[in-house]
Swiss-Prot record:
Subcellular location as annotated: Cytoplasm
Domain of life: Bacteria
GO biological process, one term: protein refolding
Alphabetical UniProt keywords: ATP-binding, Chaperone, Cytoplasm, Isomerase, Nucleotide-binding
This protein's name: Chaperonin GroEL
Amino acid sequence: MAAKDVKFGNDARVKMLKGVNVLADAVKVTLGPKGRNVILDKSFGAPTITKDGVSVAREIELEDKFENMGAQMVKEVASKANDAAGDGTTTATVLAQAIVNEGLKAVAAGMNPMDLKRGIDKAVSAVVSELKNLSKPCETSKEIEQVGTISANSDSIVGQLISQAMEKVGKEGVITVEDGTGLEDELDVVEGMQFDRGYLSPYFINKPETATVELDNPYLLLVDKKISNIRELLPVLEGVAKAGKPLLIIAEDVEGEALATLVVNTMRGIVKVAAVKAPGFGDRRKAMLQDIAILTAGTVISEEIGMELEKATLEDLGQAKRVVINKDNTTIIDGIGDEAQIKGRVAQIRQQIEESTSDYDKEKLQERVAKLAGGVAVIKVGAATEVEMKEKKDRVDDALHATRAAVEEGIVAGGGVALVRAAAKVAASLKGDNEEQNVGIKLALRAMEAPLRQIVTNAGEEASVVASAVKNGEGNFGYNAGTEQYGDMIEMGILDPTKVTRSALQFAASVAGLMITTECMVTDLPKDDKADLGAAGMGGMGGMGGMM
């Protein structure tokens, strides 16, 4: 086991604080409408330019192991805030730095760290409750647009796109962010259920000008196995031909003579057919086939439940108003499924989202909800260079998470004002069990001014003057650093999602409280590589002596 380096008391805390400040100072320059960018060097490729707090935090690793421990703990604050609300990472870092600095001053003055932490926890709990009281619902498109604009670093086009996307696909719909091909940002909305499987043969194409297959009022045959024998399909094909409607086959695969016969029948015009592979893999494939069945009022032909393809009838087939297939995607528009059954299926998937612990599974389940509930919107980010594209994509992603958080828990006045107001409201009535807890309460409430002060500092103004003016105001009165004007923050469109502000404060206080109560730090002693190299060199010289 490697030897350890151990530091105690003030020695440990000074080192830890240095690490906290290095990381927080790098992150906090990005805060607010006039926040600056940070350039991150990469081991390969061009450097990344970002204004996203968590991206900056993740890149920082310090040489001194004790300082690095402090930095890593603040990195955890930014990371947790990002996981919970998708935004507010810089605010969380600034709050953590302020609480740690104030708290360690009190510890150095001889206060009991445990009582300080209890005081901080009381203050945070009271302020979180007050934030809920100050919060107002975020319902109108205008408010959604304002939240998106602020979070995308005052980029109003991004705010508009997110607002339009939410209008089109609903607040629960899936909105994804992709690289665009031009200089402008674009919004692409796919209505109906789309999945990433294209036609199995180009001979199915009936619209050569767009290289797509379009089927009007088709039947849908859903099968959870491979089809290679055409005999299994004959009864269904005959029934569909009599009905005079087209047929879409969605199966694990269609191959061999079955695919060849379908192509020949289509080309001769005997029956209009197209075939695609079922989306997903394994259990997810079965679940998605079931989703399509509910959407189109069909049945999945599965041997697991004792159904055979040869015995399938028209009653087992789903129906939709229209299906469009290209080489990569299949879109089912207006399935005839029962509304109540679709809602029941959506509720069931939502329950699975609640119970799931994997982010990947949650994302896939959320996509299934959106496909059942009405559509998917894609924001295509345009930029002149790849470096700008990455930076912009980060901002659009943040804005998207912020608007979702706003819809979920409502909005409060932005620009750091909500925390200042909530802190002022609870300050008079909040008391600890002893004097040291009172000091903890006061330092936590004082630290809640830090985001406002940092926004003002980044805008090149005097933080103390603005903070004093904002504290003397009432309600949503605050300072718009973008226009350098005082006024009602909500009327000026400076909004923050309540969830983002709340998460930032809770995670910052949680980690900062632990750091204040630290008395000892243990790390591995650095290996003395020079000594090892010296020994190796001496051995080599000895060998040369022998040769002479």
